[in-house]
Amino acid sequence: MIKNIKIAGYQGKESVHTQTMNEFIRLINHKFSISFVEDITNYNQKASELIKQTQNGEIDVSYLFSSYFTHLIPELMYLDLPFYFRNKNDAFNKLNEKLKKIIYNQLKNSHNLILLGFWDNGTRHISSSKKFINTPDDCTGQIIRTTPNQLHIDTFKSFGFKPKPLDVLDFKKALLNGDLDAQENPLTNFYQFKVYETQKYLTKTSHVYGFCLFIINKKCFESLSHDEKEIITNSSNITNSFQRNLATEEENLLFKQIIKKNVQVSEITLKNKEKFKKISKKFHNSFFSKHNNLNF
């Protein structure tokens, strides 16, 4: 009997993550019957619901920005530390085997999930409808959408913003309603969610190098035969490499596409970046005071 695998995501057809999931499906569809809902927000469901739906087996496989998992695994806040990593390679290098093992074990032992891999969720930058965000003074009073993550909320508040934490579903609605002055996201989301229609000032802040968790329901995975598990595991490894390469290619192309949408792009100077880093330092220290085993 052919096993059915139910897959879901939260982004549109052209996004890196949806293209990546389609690659995963291509690799496994000779062995499984697949159903794939590309974007659950089109059905008025919040992106964050993917976690619970995958935990309870309503769906089998999904992906989601690591920030949405921090209430389950506080160690994941390491990947969200603002202005902490030198660059994307530094972030990937510090996502080492020790940290991966901690996350894998907690997902498996406490949350009914098996980690299939980490995806590149893109370098996060800040956009605004009012001005470039070159210094903390530029943040003052602006309503910014953040993810529903306490570290993000506290960080942007400390910069001077008025944080408005929103799931992807509500973020899209807030953009349409004109409820936001600013937002922070990787370029793929800035483009796919058409942020450029209302926010014409994009500042390359590179404040967070984001990751997605690629997951499968534990019960589903453990119900598979040895051969089926190997297919899922090997296909996941291939998919993870495919995703990182695709994400890098897209990031290089997106700036050109965004500029064509009449968006002005500026890059924060190293001197001004230090001002944000100085404010962020207290969040780094607070995290490592609780998780000093991750200070590497």
In which residue ranges do the predicted regions lie?
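A gly/proline- and charged-residue-enriched helix-loop-helix capping module
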Residues: 86-110
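N-terminal secretory/targeting leader peptides
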Residues: 1-88, 108-109, 113-296
